[in-house]
């Protein structure tokens, strides 16, 4: 894999940038640690008196907590996958590109090299997608992250709360992190609520525990509402096989822009992210389909076989292998006007 193609910055500035980028993660970690203390100690061990209730609360809480922490860890420390060297402009072409002053001639150099690569999406003007910073042709759905300083396969967005770029290699972990974070907040809110009422009405009077329990409910509710909207938005994206970037900027193919260019049907869209083994969908292990460089495309398939477009209106049961087989027979060529 390629090392990150980073813009040259003074060493001191880079160091400060790296340190500051961890601030949101530290904030979230401190809130989670406090919530663990408040729930386990102040609620379960101090406030709850029924032994059976206490044991049940602690058992379920730690199960949800471990899943939440596991997915958060994976979202933070799973590096985004980068394009391989075959997408990097070779030395000879790079020399020609750098020495050429005419933009049209530069586009022609890139287009000639890109004909050897499995790339089908284009810029808005129809040119080959090329990263000037990394000096490489961008694979489909790949974008350059200015924060990470590198091109990321199937880039969705850069998330400051995990200090990582979310893309092909870790999007499943990010979704599971949102889901288990919501479940964590929901479970805390549901189990704390009855004791919140008791403290609020002064039925219980433990001063220190009262503060933690009352504040715990407010924090859990606040995070749950925020996460609910974010998770719902990403569920919508997954159902359409889109990334956040593609939702804001429609992918462009040879025949033009198509916001549903990668839409394969809800079931197959889910499998693109979570894989075919449903027993592994809720576990933070990598199961996404493909290699990160090529993707089944509805537009490519339909342009090759127009009957497929009508057929898809009635049947949505093609396997990913069949869909990919259709797409692999379709090749898109860029024509540069002189």
Curated annotation (Swiss-Prot):
The chain crosses the membrane at residues 21-41, 57-77, 173-193, 211-234. Residues 129-179 form the DHHC domain. Residues 1-20, 78-172, 235-338 are cytoplasmic. GO terms for molecular function: protein-cysteine S-myristoyltransferase activity; protein-cysteine S-palmitoyltransferase activity; protein-cysteine S-stearoyltransferase activity; zinc ion binding. GO terms for biological process: peptidyl-L-cysteine S-palmitoylation; protein localization to membrane; protein targeting to Golgi apparatus; protein targeting to membrane; synaptic vesicle maturation. GO terms for cellular component: endoplasmic reticulum; Golgi apparatus; Golgi membrane; postsynaptic density. Autopalmitoylated (in vitro). Its main location: Golgi. Its EC number is 2.3.1.225, 2.3.1.-. It is found in: Golgi apparatus membrane; Postsynaptic density. Zn(2+) 1 binds at residues 131, 134, 144, 151. It catalyses: L-cysteinyl-[protein] + hexadecanoyl-CoA = S-hexadecanoyl-L-cysteinyl-[protein] + CoA; L-cysteinyl-[protein] + tetradecanoyl-CoA = S-tetradecanoyl-L-cysteinyl-[protein] + CoA; L-cysteinyl-[protein] + octadecanoyl-CoA = S-octadecanoyl-L-cysteinyl-[protein] + CoA. Residues 42-56, 194-210 are lumenal. Belongs to the DHHC palmitoyltransferase family. PANTHER family: PALMITOYLTRANSFERASE ZDHHC16 (PTHR12246). The DHHC domain is required for palmitoyltransferase activity. Palmitoyltransferase that catalyzes the addition of palmitate onto various protein substrates. Has no stringent fatty acid selectivity and in addition to palmitate can also transfer onto target proteins myristate from tetradecanoyl-CoA and stearate from octadecanoyl-CoA. May thereby regulate target proteins association and localization to membranes. In the nervous system, probably catalyzes the palmitoylation of synaptic proteins and is involved in the differentiation of dopaminergic neurons and the development of the diencephalon. This is Palmitoyltransferase ZDHHC15. It comes from Xenopus laevis. The lineage of its organism: Eukaryota, Metazoa, Chordata, Craniata, Vertebrata.
